[in-house]
Amino acid sequence: MKKILLTNDDGYHAKGIKALEQALENMAEIYVVAPKHEKSACSQCITITAPLRAEKIKGKEGRHYRIDDGTPSDCVYLAINELFKHVCFDLVISGINLGSNMGEDTIYSGTVAGAIEGTIQGVPSIAISQILSNKNKNTPLSFDLAQKIIQDLVQNVFTKGYPLKGRKLLNVNVPNCSLQEYKGERITPKGYRLYKKEVHKRTDPKNESYFWLGLHPLKWQKRENEDRLSDFDAIASNHASITPLNLDLTSYDDLKSLESWHEGMLK
């Protein structure tokens, strides 16, 4: 039977990872290793300055752990190299995240980082995120569409094989719409996210300042010379976006021009 490792950045008790497990439990043997607490926007952080403690969850056949103060990358690394080191995983899936992970947000994302860690460890990996109608994660939300999309995608992987070679992963974003309103999937590049220099300053009861970051609305623009719809465009039209991501961040187009710019300094 196929074996899938699940993680997330919203925490072990989050609704999204429970919905993900429910969607896949009849398709494969499911293992879950997730942070004990929310670790959103922690990116590829791994813990090397403090010990990690893994708590085995009772009643889950020894296949569920939550990691005290662990990040998604910690969880995947620990699962593959120690907790389940004798298990050969067919897939690592990170999600279902509460909120989008599109454009440059993928650099910040703990959800995407979980899938990146799976890729680094040599396991085909997928990150999946559910768009929210607002910033309130307690807003009632159906995962029916996200569950259907991940079921279809996993079945395709099991039938045809993983579609990417090398250190690459799939990043999936699901629109906030009903099954009836859904328009299908689109293969997309990352869009160009627009960020505002926005910091929310507050004062606590002791008259000390504190700050909230990252509360600006989702805005984007088209990349130059890009004919394809981006992940943002797909979501805006009630399509799911499926974006291949590459771990190689080298800007190959700039190597020769950089050599010319640096000419005379190279020894």
Swiss-Prot record:
Keywords associated with the record: Cytoplasm, Hydrolase, Metal-binding, Nucleotide-binding
Chief place of localization: cytoplasm
GO annotations of cellular component type: cytoplasm
Top-rank taxon, per record: Bacteria
Reaction equations catalysed: a ribonucleoside 5'-phosphate + H2O = a ribonucleoside + phosphate
EC number: 3.1.3.5
Major enzyme class: hydrolase
A GO MF label: exopolyphosphatase activity
Subcellular location(s) of the protein: Cytoplasm
Database matches in Pfam families: SurE
Cofactor: a divalent metal cation
Transmembrane stretches, start-end: none
Gene3D superfamilies assigned to the protein according to its UniProt record, in alphabetical order: Survival protein SurE-like phosphatase/nucleotidase
Assigned protein family: Belongs to the SurE nucleotidase family.
Protein's recorded name: 5'-nucleotidase SurE
Organism encoding this protein: Helicobacter pylori (strain J99 / ATCC 700824)
Gene from which the chain derives: surE
